[in-house]
């Protein structure tokens, strides 16, 4: 069976490096993953957004960095402290799909690639964000979901 999507070696290596480098991080880290348009449909790390994501200090900054007209996958390392006082940094895949995405093609492409990306990133924790994080309550809801992973 032929696959519509392709993940190159460079992208695989970047995901692997992100996973290992964020295992004990004390700050939020995020890796933006997107699908290239026709004809390749290659899954790549979005370098333009990545520079800004490397500087992120709070979840509310995601809305300013991520596009409001295109979906993304954001592999996120979110450090938390458990009730027992242990520090942990779970990897969570955030499926960014703002309500303003009008292209049915993009919605279908990202929905179809979701399981492939989850498997490649090695996480089964998934949070779908469709609010655009415009309100403080949206950011707080995302924060709670990340802390409960």
From Swiss-Prot:
Source organism of the structure: Saccharomyces cerevisiae (strain ATCC 204508 / S288c)
Cellular component terms per the entry's GO annotation: actin cortical patch; cortical actin cytoskeleton; cytoplasm; nucleus
UniProt cross-references to Pfam families, sorted A to Z: Cofilin_ADF (PF00241)
Miscellaneous comment text of the record: Present with 3040 molecules/cell in log phase SD medium.
InterPro entries in UniProt: ADF-H, ADF-H/Gelsolin-like_dom_sf, GMF
Residue(s) carrying Phosphoserine: 137
Domain of life: Eukaryota
Protein family per UniProt: Belongs to the actin-binding proteins ADF family. GMF subfamily.
Record's subcellular location: Cytoplasm; Nucleus
Gene: AIM7
Phenotype upon loss of function: Sensitive to nickel.
Keywords: Acetylation, Cytoplasm, Nucleus, Phosphoprotein
Role this protein plays: May be involved in mitochondrial organization and biogenesis.
Name used for this protein in its record: Protein AIM7
Modified residues (N-acetylserine): 2
PANTHER family reported for this sequence: GLIA MATURATION FACTOR (PTHR11249:SF2), GLIAL FACTOR NATURATION FACTOR (PTHR11249)
Primary residence: cytoplasm
Molecular function GO terms recorded: actin binding; Arp2/3 complex binding
ADF-H domain mapped to chain residues: 3-147
One GO term (biological process): negative regulation of Arp2/3 complex-mediated actin nucleation
